[in-house]
């Protein structure tokens, strides 16, 4: 029962579309009608050009899955229950009940969940994203690389004892690939939008 409760709690918390809400409150309207149509951090930056809204969206999207995992771990005294809650948080972000199950791609939520459940893996995944972004300037490629390497990081540090994390992170990496289908196609065709680090934002 603790697993089901944690999964549902994580899902409903993850379903809160912070990027959409923040953009509405800031006067930008429905972010789903602009840019890539996504409700996540990258599209918030693309549409608003505001670092404050982008950073807040990143923190809240990462935090909701991470918080769900930490709270479930604390309440039930089980790391595996916390892992399930974190998974629920990512699923909620990707398939929010409030938006007809049409949500984001779950990168920030996944990284937040990893930081909460297996900190060393979360840190390495974040660093991987940064390095890839600096080298190739593709947000999607950076995310896919970071999340795909996470299961290997978990196994490298935990061995057989880390199998629950390896499986969970592998599932999230696969989910991310599915959510990034259009990005992968654009990468292959050389049409993916690059991150412009030189462009000034407010």
Predicted regions mapped to residue ranges:
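Helix-coil boundary and interhelical linker segments in multi-pass alpha-helical membrane proteins
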Residues: 1-9, 67-84, 115-122, 155-168
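N-terminal signal-anchor transmembrane alpha helix
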Residues: 1-27
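Hydrophobic alpha-helical transmembrane segments
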Residues: 4-9, 54-55, 82-87, 111, ...
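C-terminal ends of transmembrane helices
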Residues: 19-22, 92-102, 129-136, 181-185
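Cytosolic, membrane-interface loops and tails of multi-pass inner-membrane proteins
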Residues: 22-54, 185-202
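Short, non-helical or kinked segments that cap or interrupt transmembrane helices
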Residues: 29-38, 98-111, 138-146
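Interfacial segments of multi-pass membrane proteins
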Residues: 45-49, 72-75, 88, 92, ...
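Multi-pass membrane catalytic core of lipid/isoprenoid biosynthesis enzymes
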Residues: 46-73
